[in-house]
């Protein structure tokens, strides 16, 4: 059987560019090369697409603080529709070999917010992960929280600020509604980019200003005192949940540097040391949240577990990290699904969903 050509899209014009490079490296290293040929489609920080050399595409590959995408001489253009070649060399207009499926691993803005997914749908390319709507909904913390709350799922109390109403609530009003500490977050960022923990008014004003540097909408939420538990979900119509893992912090909260730069910032415990009935409860909630937001392929569901075993959903990440310390592949490894098999299954799910989508009627 001929091998499938998998286009790994990574990098991106995003605050999480370097995280994406780390994830892409691990996927390239782990993918089953007896089944798949890899085509590296790197997006630089200016948003330009390139075809990268699979043998030499990263600088400082083993240094998360300085990892970078190597320049490529081949710029990429895309042709939408059912063409034999969906990708062409932008310099000379010559078609590039057909890509059978896309594995997007562009974290953050323009990568997991539905933008990239919409482009791939227009191009009629199968792709790993959630579709346009669910990607956008999960990326937007305000929208995701409203949908989860309306479905009867437990979330932290919150208020949403926009550039037009950011001064509608005084700090005293915010504190009265949500208490202290607070967390202030850009609505559409991941990896704790622009997130601040707030204990007083001065910190609050600084945190809101910082969050608005990254987004036009900001979520202010009640700080939940509890253990940080994560669960991986895999599947399309009948998703499965992994065992749970725990992030044990050695710092104030799970900030960007704690996640990706500081090796001593947090400890990942897999499986989480929680009673089996609590583990099963979180797994069931994770699947319910996944289905509520219309996810497909994969997502990581992050929750807080309070002292009385109340489960509070924090957020859902539709393109979880695949870095050396990322929880998603570790959770499936602990559940009996190895890294290589996980990647293969994600590609299979992408092809299954693409086939189902193309079977839908488009005419009356």
UniProtKB/Swiss-Prot annotation:
UniProt catalytic activity: 2 D-alanine + ATP = D-alanyl-D-alanine + ADP + phosphate + H(+)
Residues that bind ATP: 175-230
UniProt cofactor note: Binds 2 magnesium or manganese ions per subunit.
Disulphide connectivity of cysteines: none
Enzyme nomenclature, EC number: 6.3.2.4
Sites where the protein binds Mg(2+) 2: 315, 317
Coiled-coil stretches noted in the UniProt entry, renumbered to this chain: none
InterPro entries: ATP-grasp, ATP_grasp_subdomain_1, D-Ala_lig_Van_CS, D_ala_D_ala, Dala_Dala_lig_C, Dala_Dala_lig_N, PreATP-grasp_dom_sf
Top-rank taxon: Bacteria
Domain ATP-grasp: 145-348
Database matches in Gene3D superfamilies: 3.40.50.20, ATP-grasp fold, A domain, ATP-grasp fold, B domain
Membrane spanning stretches: none
Main localization (coarse): cytoplasm
Annotated compartments: Cytoplasm
Single annotated GO MF: D-alanine-D-alanine ligase activity
Pfam families per record: Dala_Dala_lig_C (PF07478), Dala_Dala_lig_N (PF01820)
Pathway(s) annotated for this protein in UniProt: Cell wall biogenesis; peptidoglycan biosynthesis
Binding site for Mg(2+) 1: 302, 315
Keywords, sorted A to Z: ATP-binding, Cell shape, Cell wall biogenesis/degradation, Cytoplasm, Ligase, Magnesium, Manganese, Metal-binding, Nucleotide-binding, Peptidoglycan synthesis
Cofactor(s) the record lists: Mg(2+); Mn(2+)
A GO-annotated cellular component: cytosol
Function according to Swiss-Prot or TrEMBL: Cell wall formation.
Entry's family note: Belongs to the D-alanine--D-alanine ligase family.
Name used for this protein in its record: D-alanine--D-alanine ligase A
Organism: Salmonella typhimurium (strain LT2 / SGSC1412 / ATCC 700720)
């Amino acid at each position: 059987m001929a091998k499938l050509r998998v286009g790994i899209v990574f990098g991106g014009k995003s605050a999480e560019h370097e995280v994406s490079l780390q994830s892409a490296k691990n996927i390239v290293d782990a993918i089953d090369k007896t089944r798949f040929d890899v085509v590296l489609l790197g997006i630089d920080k200016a948003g330009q697409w390139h075809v990268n050399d699979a043998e030499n595409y990263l600088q400082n590959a083993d240094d998360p603080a300085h990892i970078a995408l190597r320049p490529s001489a081949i710029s990429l253009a895309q042709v939408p529709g059912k063409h034999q070649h969906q990708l062409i060399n932008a310099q000379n207009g010559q078609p590039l070999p057909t890509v059978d499926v896309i594995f997007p691993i562009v974290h953050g803005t323009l990568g997991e917010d539905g933008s990239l997914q919409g482009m791939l749908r227009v191009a009629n390319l199968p792709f790993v992960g959630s579709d346009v709507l669910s990607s956008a909904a999960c990326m937007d913390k305000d929208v995701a929280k409203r949908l989860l709350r309306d479905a009867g799922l437990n979330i932290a109390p919150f208020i949403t600020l926009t550039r037009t109403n950011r001064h509608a609530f005084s700090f005293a009003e915010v504190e009265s509604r949500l208490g202290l500490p607070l967390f202030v977050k850009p609505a559409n960022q991941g990896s704790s980019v622009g997130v601040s923990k707030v204990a007083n008014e001065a910190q609050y004003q600084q945190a809101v200003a910082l969050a608005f540097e990254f987004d036009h909408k900001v979520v202010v939420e009640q700080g939940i005192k509890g253990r940080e538990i994560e669960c991986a979900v895999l599947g399309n119509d009948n998703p499965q949940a992994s065992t749970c893992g725990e992030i044990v912090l050695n710092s104030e909260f799970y900030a960007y540097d704690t996640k990706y730069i500081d090796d001593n910032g947090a400890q990942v415990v897999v499986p989480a040391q929680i009673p089996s009935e609590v583990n099963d409860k979180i797994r069931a909630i994770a699947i319910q949240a996944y289905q509520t937001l219309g996810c497909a392929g994969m997502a990581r569901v992050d929750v807080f577990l309070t002292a009385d075993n109340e489960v509070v959903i924090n957020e859902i990440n539709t393109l979880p990290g695949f870095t050396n310390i990322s929880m998603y592949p570790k959770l499936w490894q602990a559940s009996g699904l190895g890294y290589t098999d996980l990647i293969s299954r994600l590609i299979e799910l992408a092809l299954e969903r693409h086939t189902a989508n193309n079977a839908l009627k488009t005419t009356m």
